Amino acid sequence: LIVRSKENLTHLIPEVREELEHLANLQVRDDELRFVFDPRYREYLTPDFRRFLGLFRFDMRYVHVSQENGQIAIRVRGPMLHCIMFEIPVLAIVSELRNRTKYPDAQLSQVRDRLYQKFEWLEKNATKEELADFRVSDFSTRRRLSQVAQREVVEVMSRDFPGVFVGTSNPA
């Protein structure tokens, strides 16, 4: 993790470590494996990858959280197969902990209001034809305010987005 701002996140180190430890307890459940083995998804997930999901566990030996140059530093080093799986959860954890501290009073109503303001702007500045071709997907897991807020955004987008909402990268 490279923090590109001057915002000091070192106070998050204990909570980041605690949340990362929870990852080590995660594993794909049997019902989830049945879901990914559904024939409808055959073209998206190879049999080897589906079997891999059943075996995979986050290995905390590869994650190092420290303070460097007055900033939080998170390094994941080890076999690529294991390290790449940490990227999104690590970024989501840091983002959510940071936002919980920075915006402790944030409300879902504020998230919805801001989203509807953006919808209004789009409707005012784009034609119906442009909106009919305007396709958007949600990829905000790494930078979301919170999981609850992201769920709300996805629900509102799927129901009320004036263009074409394609879906989300985060089905959970």
Label the model's feature ranges:
Residues L1-A172:
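Ordered alpha/beta subdomains of enzyme catalytic regions
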